[in-house]
Curated annotation (Swiss-Prot):
NAD(+) binds at residues 8-13, 78-80, 102-105. This is 4-hydroxy-tetrahydrodipicolinate reductase. GO terms for cellular component: cytosol. Keywords: Amino-acid biosynthesis, Cytoplasm, Diaminopimelate biosynthesis, Lysine biosynthesis, NAD, NADP, Oxidoreductase. Its main location: cytoplasm. It comes from Rickettsia canadensis (strain McKiel). The lineage of its organism: Bacteria, Pseudomonadati, Pseudomonadota, Alphaproteobacteria, Rickettsiales. The keyword Oxidoreductase applies. It comes from the Bacteria. Coiled coil: none annotated. The active site is at residues 134, 138. Disulfide bonds: none annotated. GO terms for molecular function: 4-hydroxy-tetrahydrodipicolinate reductase; NAD binding; NADP binding; oxidoreductase activity, acting on CH or CH2 groups, NAD or NADP as acceptor.
């Protein structure tokens, strides 16, 4: 039996994971951490968990990582809005622990990332724009997924990622991200490749949180026999 701790248990993703855990054999929720708990509770929670899934806030990450290192608890990190210091923390901890980080745990979004990486090889002279749409209550903008997609496309192309152009025209050597927040939209990401004659658009839309929850649980199971390293969902789905 795999004991899975859950950080951010009262949020949308935490609830979705708890609701779907019974669909996976030999898995159970061993601990639930939320904003009502003390950070010190993470010590005991990590002690009794084989792996911790984190969908909380960036402020909790350092404490969670420290207790995970203390108890050799594997980590699946889905919290977005992380800063460079957080990624450095994960990279260092991954020398000791198997850790999987992804801004989006669904197979669809990761397939979109792969398709975009392949498309830019052919459409390398096209303008690239990303549209990121989420519900009105999402805090980070642009989304972690939008940044992941932009970084995938920009990798090796020497392209700047732009969130706000202000009053200037578009430059050729950039990828623009536009964010919309409103209603109860779960998640929509569109990547458009544009030239003077045509527009090619790749799109992923999540209709609910189930695909993210399924991906997170699969990641927790997948990590069990893996050596220490920092992994992504593309390692699970084998789409590079």
């Amino acid at each position: 039996m795999i004991n899975i701790g859950l950080s951010g248990s009262t949020g949308k993703m935490g609830r979705a994971i708890a609701e779907r855990i019974d669909e996976f054999e030999n898995c159970k929720i061993s601990a639930k951490f939320s904003s009502t708990n003390s950070l010190y509770d993470l010590d005991n929670f990590c002690k009794h968990s084989d792996v911790f899934i984190d969908f909380s806030t960036p402020e909790i990450l350092e404490t969670l990582v420290n207790y995970a290192l203390k108890h050799n608890t594997k980590l699946v990190i889905g919290t977005t809005g992380l800063q460079p210091k957080h990624f450095k923390l994960l990279e260092k901890a991954a020398q000791t622990l198997p850790i999987l980080y992804s801004a989006n745990m669904s197979i669809g979004a990761n397939l979109l990332s792969y398709l975009a990486k392949e498309a830019i090889k052919i459409l390398d002279d096209y303008d690239v724009e990303i549209l990121d749409i989420h519900h009105r209550n999402k805090k980070d903008s642009p989304s972690g997924t939008a940044i992941m997609l932009a970084e995938t496309i920009a990798n090796g192309k020497d392209l700047d990622i732009i969130f706000n152009r202000g009053n200037r025209p578009r430059k050729k050597e950039e990828i623009g991200i536009s964010s919309l927040r409103g209603g109860n939209v779960h998640s929509i990401h569109e990547i458009s490749f544009l030239d003077d004659n045509e527009i090619i658009t790749l799109k992923h839309e999540a209709l609910n949180n189930n695909s993210f929850a399924n991906g997170a649980i699969k990641a927790a199971i997948w990590l069990q026999d893996k050596p220490s390293a920092l992994y992504s969902m593309q390692d699970i789905y084998k789409i590079y």
